[in-house]
Amino acid sequence: MATYPMHVAGLDRDFPICKVTDDLYIGAFIMFGDAELTVRCAEELLKLAEGIDYDYLFTAEAKSIPLIHEMARQSGAKKYFIARKGPKVYMPAPISVEDK
C-alpha cells in the first residue's frame, strides 16, 4: 500500500494514501490504534488552548473520540461531550437540536 509521510506532534508517521475521487487521493490521517500519536496530539491541542477559559471539551462523533478522551484525561476534565447525528438507546436524556 502506498503511504504519505507526515510529521505530526513531533512524531513521524506514514499514512495510507486513499482514493477520494478518480483524480483525488489523500494521505488518511488515522489515529485509531496509535496511542502514542493520540497522546501527543492531545498535548499539542491543549497547548493551543492554554490561557483560554473554556467550560467544556466538545467534539463530533467517531474518529475524534479517542482524542477528546485523552485531552480530558490530560487536562483533568471530569467530562467531555460528543455531538452525534442522533440519540442512542443508552442515552437517558440527550440534549437535542433540530436542523434542516
Regions found by a protein language model. Give the residues of each.
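Active-site-facing substrate-recognition patch
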Residues: 1-54
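Short, hydrophobic/aromatic-rich beta-strand segments within well-structured domains
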Residues: 57, 69-70, 81
